[in-house]
């Protein structure tokens, strides 16, 4: 039996390791819902969320007007984006199809959650009419918007969802005014007659069709063409962009449609950074949406930092009062590293019934050897432990429990030290995919094999700054270093800035072990020789 044969699901399947907020096609949605692992930690977060949100679906929602914010935090790769994306499917009760079968999002959770009362709360929430708008704020913002960026993105995604012009808010405002007067359909009909094209198709090029717009407005409203032309010419100047107006427009839409609305904003913490004015805008938008919309409009954001850490530096530096935003985002969900390891085990590393006794036999024969082989030296600051039981060995093999902690630190350090390109810096690479890539590399090998740490380098290589990856590639190909030397160089690069693990000789030996029965004395000699080159 080789490593490829021990897993319940194929190692080479598409697991959507890269979660993109706006990739919501049926095929992706089905896989994400079907394979989503509700760990103990995630079930706790879901309970906390629905305890907060369910009252907003009933007559007591007005009492929620000051508590309509949810702040989801966690380190890079912890699953924040995946969590709110799954929430978006669930709260909109998204219908997905796969091979002729149709299911609603809620049905996937009936198999994942055993608590009937908790399921009843979820069921109540998902069957309340709700409009969910999920977006990555950085991908939707214009670089020139600066302090108004957050408000403009909120307005942009709202206009887009309700059918108005997304890219030009003053055009959307014209559409909204015509709709209020009951003249929007007449305007679109007149425009189509005049131009032989639809308004929705042409409105982003309104600069080139101002005469046609004026004529269509005249026919729809009954005013003169000259008055209509003046209206068109003044649209941009007269557009009232402020937070209060935005919230009023949301309220009017909610009143008309009898729904709740959720703005789910991915990576808001990274987008705001240390910009005090942006944080104040987010605070005001959340506060006004809560009050004006009476608990029917919610804001759910993700951030690598928890809310106290995100605003702490700003308050001390600029003397601003962010106490309101702390109150508005009263529901705070922090994803941890334990959640990541459990997700990887359940999505990637579940073993077949035939593999479990085979691995149990390996542990019974080699357990003591594994404990000694995979221990780090006393300089190690974190509790980076090897396997402690047969069950843990079976659950994690061919990986070691400390792989999760160290790889998390590697991802964080590469980002913060500037070695990563834009995609990795924006959270476009997950630990799940890194573990899948490493497992695939050793899949033909037997059950005496382990994953040496350098195997994780392949998962991030293409996302490094070209100068960094080129240096490592050239060093490996210069004729002086052999394959073992090159692999050790990759290990040294990966742990260079990892503070919980020093690159001592003994630690490098432990990280380089690729067989259970590796001769550690001989491996130490090879590592030492390689370091001296």
Feature locations, PLM:
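P-loop NTPase motor core
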Residues: 70-75, 82-207, 327, 331-345
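Conserved nucleotide-binding/hydrolysis micro-motifs of P-loop NTPases
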Residues: 12, 91, 139-143, 269-270, ...
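Long, low-complexity, polar/charged, intrinsically disordered or flexibly structured peripheral segments
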Residues: 195-246
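Walker A/P-loop-proximal flanking segment of P-loop NTPase domains
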Residues: 1-78, 85, 89-91, 148, ...
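The catalytic "switch" region of P-loop NTPases
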Residues: 1-22, 275, 281-384
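Extended, well-ordered alpha-helical scaffold/bundle regions in very large, multi-domain proteins
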Residues: 171-174, 294-315, 484, 500-533
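Conserved Walker B catalytic segment
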Residues: 240-294
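C-terminal helical "lid" subdomain and adjoining coupling/linker elements of P-loop NTPases
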Residues: 278, 358-359, 369-484, 495-506, ...
């Amino acid at each position: 039996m080789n490593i490829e044969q021990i897993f319940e699901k194929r190692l080479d399947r598409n697991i959507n390791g890269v979660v993109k907020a706006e990739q919501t096609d049926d095929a992706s949605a089905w896989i994400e819902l079907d394979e989503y692992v509700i760990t103990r930690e995630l079930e706790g977060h879901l309970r906390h969320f629905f305890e907060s949100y369910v009252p907003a679906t009933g007559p007591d929602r007005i009492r929620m007007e000051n508590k309509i914010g949810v702040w989801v935090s966690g380190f890079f790769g912890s699953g924040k984006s995946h969590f709110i994306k799954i929430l978006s499917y669930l709260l909109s009760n998204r219908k997905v199809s796969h091979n002729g079968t149709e299911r609603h999002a809620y049905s996937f959770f009936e198999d994942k959650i055993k608590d009937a009362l908790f399921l009843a709360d979820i069921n109540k929430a998902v069957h309340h009419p709700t409009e969910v708008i999920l977006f990555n704020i950085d991908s939707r913002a214009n670089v020139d918007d600066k302090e108004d960026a957050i408000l403009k993105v909120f307005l942009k995604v709202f206009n887009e969802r309700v059918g108005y012009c997304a890219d030009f808010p003053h055009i959307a405002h014209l559409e909204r005014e015509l709709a209020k007067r009951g003249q929007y359909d007449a305007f679109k009909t007149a425009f189509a007659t005049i131009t032989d094209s639809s308004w929705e198709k042409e409105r982003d090029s309104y600069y080139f069709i101002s005469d046609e717009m004026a004529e269509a407005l005249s026919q729809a409203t009954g005013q003169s063409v000259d008055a209509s032309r003046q209206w068109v010419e003044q649209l941009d100047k007269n557009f009232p962009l402020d937070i209060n107006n935005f919230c009023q427009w949301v309220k009017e839409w909610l009143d008309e449609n009898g729904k709740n609305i959720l703005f789910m904003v991915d990576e808001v913490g990274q987008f705001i950074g240390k910009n005090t004015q942006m944080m104040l805008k987010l605070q005001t938008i959340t506060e006004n949406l809560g009050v004006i919309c009476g608990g029917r409009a919610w804001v759910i954001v993700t951030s690598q930092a928890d809310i106290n850490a995100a605003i702490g530096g700003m308050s001390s530096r600029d003397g601003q009062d962010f106490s309101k935003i702390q109150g508005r985002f009263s529901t705070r969900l922090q994803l941890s590293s334990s959640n990541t390891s459990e997700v990887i085990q359940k999505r990637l590393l579940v073993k077949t019934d035939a593999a479990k006794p085979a691995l149990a036999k390996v542990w019974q024969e080699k357990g003591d050897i594994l404990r000694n082989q995979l221990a780090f030296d006393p300089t190690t600051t974190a509790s980076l432990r090897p396997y402690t039981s047969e069950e843990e060995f079976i659950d994690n093999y061919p990986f070691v429990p400390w792989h999760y902690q160290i790889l998390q630190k590697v991802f964080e350090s590469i980002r913060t030290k500037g070695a990563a390109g834009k995609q990795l810096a924006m959270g476009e690479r997950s630990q799940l995919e890194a573990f899948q890539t490493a497992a695939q590399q050793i899949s033909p090998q037997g059950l005496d094999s382990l994953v040496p740490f350098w195997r994780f380098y392949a998962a991030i290589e293409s996302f490094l700054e070209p100068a960094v990856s080129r240096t490592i590639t050239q060093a490996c190909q210069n004729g002086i270093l052999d394959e073992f030397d090159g692999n050790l160089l990759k290990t040294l690069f990966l742990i260079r800035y990892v503070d919980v693990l020093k690159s001592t000789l003994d630690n490098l030996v432990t990280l380089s072990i690729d067989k259970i029965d590796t001769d550690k004395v001989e491996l130490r000699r090879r590592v030492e020789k390689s370091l001296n080159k």
